[in-house]
Amino acid sequence: MKVTVLVGGVGGARFLLGVQQLFGLGQFRAQRHTHGRPDTAAGSHELTAIVNIGDDAWIHGLRVCPDLDTCMYTLGGGVDPERGWGHRDETWHAKEELARYGVQPDWFGLGDRDIGTHLVRTQMLNAGYPLTQITAALCDRWQPGARLLPVSDDRCETHVVITDPDDGSRRAIHFQEWWVRYRAQVPTHSFAFVGAEKAAATTETIAAIADADVILIAPSNPVVSVGAILAVPGVRGALRAAGAPIVGYSPIIGGKPLRGMADACLSVIGVESTAEAVGRHYGARRGTGILDCWLVSQDDHADIEGVAVRAVPLMMTDPAATAEMVSAGLQLAGVTP
């Protein structure tokens, strides 16, 4: 079975672990058994993640791709378990030395181990390699047990229009500055996907959607993760034309985001922080949207015309619990693993 998942960073990576556990992929391959024997059918499953690139930025001359790296480190077993991003056993000597020089930005730190990833990526970009090939090369080191695809090889960065807290002017800043420096706590007016007008989804991304047996939308931020993926020309059309069912998972539980600041992002675009509102924001494929099925928390409700809805536990407490979420979505879509 070919499974394609649209994901952001930390939450998306944890969701992918659940998919892997359900299908016996990646680090869970040896754990899946049938009648006491290894399940050889696990080898027939293929997992592809289409990953947000809207967070990507140039930091200290290095190309940083936070969501791609978080997925790669998480699935490869090297992520910091406390933060949910970055390297395990990270050190920060380079960051400390840059601070002594007064180098800006001082609000975004790169770990010493993490810098190795960014150096390789930047060197390959300078040599003319596209991001898709670079990501595949980086994954050779991490062996994530899934194909990680940047949605595009082109620049398509999320910027945020704010009121500057210092002088009151209205200006656009990179999403990383809004998220990391200001913690989304400044007057915010809109989001813009810079470069989208010239960007295009990669052929690999379009093929992963067209060839899938089921397409899952992880409970990632619907505005700056999934929304940024959908902003890349070609993606929405490919989803609407896909032969596979599309199953989405609500990032909102009981009116609060599963993690991160999705509620702040939704407020900016005028969408309520409810499972139903986010489902309506994505919309039904029978209409002009992208959903066939929508999973919400047991404590939530959603009535969306043209979309099959089911309430199940959505807390990703561990890969096993997440695998149950994934399984429930497949059942709702009528897909048998």
Curated annotation (Swiss-Prot):
Function recorded in the entry: Catalyzes the transfer of the phosphoenolpyruvate moiety from enoylpyruvoyl-2-diphospho-5'-guanosine (EPPG) to 7,8-didemethyl-8-hydroxy-5-deazariboflavin (FO) with the formation of dehydro coenzyme F420-0 and GMP.
GO molecular function annotation: LPPG:FO 2-phospho-L-lactate transferase activity; magnesium ion binding
Assembly behavior: Homodimer.
Catalytic activity from the UniProt record: enolpyruvoyl-2-diphospho-5'-guanosine + 7,8-didemethyl-8-hydroxy-5-deazariboflavin = dehydro coenzyme F420-0 + GMP + H(+)
SUPFAM superfamilies xrefs: CofD-like (SSF142338)
Xref: HAMAP family: CofD
Disulfide bridge map: none
Broad enzyme group: transferase
Residues binding 7,8-didemethyl-8-hydroxy-5-deazariboflavin: 69
Pfam families in the cross-refs: CofD (PF01933)
The keyword Magnesium appears for this protein: yes
Annotated EC: 2.7.8.28
Family per similarity comment: Belongs to the CofD family.
Highest taxon of the lineage: Bacteria
Transmembrane segments: none
Stated name of the protein: Phosphoenolpyruvate transferase
